[in-house]
Amino acid sequence: MKFVDEVSIFVKAGDGGNGMMSFRREKFIEKGGPNGGDGGDGGSVYLEADENLNTLVDYRYTRRFQAQNGQKGGSTDCTGAKGEDLILPVPVGTTVIDAATQEIMGDLTKAGQRLLVAQGGWHGLGNTRFKSSTNRAPRQTTPGKPGDARDLKLELKVLADVGLLGLPNAGKSTFIRSVSAAKPKVADYPFTTLVPNLGVVSVGRYKSFVIADIPGLIEGASEGAGLGIRFLKHLARTRLLLHLVDMAPLDGSDPADAAEVILHELEKFSPALTQRDRWLVLNKADQLLEEEREERVRHVVERLDWKGPVFVISALESEGTEALSQAIMRYLDERAVRIAEEPEYAEALAELDRQIEDEARARLQELDDQRALRRAGVKSVEEADDDDFDDDDDDEGGAEIIYVR
């Protein structure tokens, strides 16, 4: 199944039913009074988070949805039937945006969570409602109100505790295969990973966390080059970033250069994202002799002026991966305790999350606008070449994200 993480849809709530004008007409009853009933309310449109979904592909081709209208009122004071609500299932992690105002209507982050996106129209009133001491036979009714209608933009961000950053072929997919039961494709060419991969890492008997791998970043990614830029937004909700660096690149390049490329592209994409806690993970250490390994580790750390945690591992040989997984679990546990005990810390993290999402959305919108200009034949000197940008309209391949234990 193709992985689709952005769609635009139109939703229309049902209109309210009109009120009924009628009068009581029975044998032996003269001048029967009004008995027109009210109409029924229109059905509303809801989005509901469904843990069984992991892509928005269902909304790629069917994009218009309307709830049922309310029925008109009946005679003998019968109220019209209410229109049936329309419930649209979406994956957990979907952000709902009003396309007209760009206002975020809500985030569906828990299974079963429901969000009202279009309110059904109010019912019309029958003529019985207008009976009074001075007007015993009213001929007045009201029509039902129209239901809400709006264009929505749905954005899916995978929910993971830990996100992986790195150049193509840094060993991110191999690392996920090493620490979880997930089996993403691994090969010796760039961009083996085309969509986010998720794996559930079990630590001990009862604890686990979710780790996400996105397509590798390349130089110029913040300007649209490569595949990874569009998927950087999926790291907005992670709690920790692991920066994987290939310590033994086949082309003999300096690992510190590769690390600096990632930091530079991350800063240009979202300065707030660089404030997320990050750990440096130096991979493929098994391919170096001990002295050379120590020298390269020291060189990378000094070149980056890295102050945070550093782990030296071999994902292929599973060396150091267990210690890293345990350290991540401890970090996540301590973070959860601190959030519960320190309201200021929790609010600061929430504000950082909002800032990251705002910056990511603004940057991606800017890239979309540049692409639209190019398609219209308008060129800009400042805009970067976006020929390598992954275009969902042209890509019929893809895969679904699966949580695997």
Swiss-Prot record:
Its cofactor is Mg(2+). GO terms for molecular function: GTP binding; GTPase activity; magnesium ion binding. The keyword Signal does not apply. This is GTPase Obg. It comes from the Bacteria. One of its GO terms (cellular component) is cytoplasm. Residues 383-398 have a biased composition (Acidic residues). Residues 1-159 form the Obg domain. PROSITE patterns: G_OBG, GTP1_OBG, OBG. It is found in: Cytoplasm. GO terms for biological process: ribosome biogenesis. NCBIfam families: Obg_CgtA (TIGR02729), PRK12297.1 (NF008955), PRK12299.1 (NF008956).
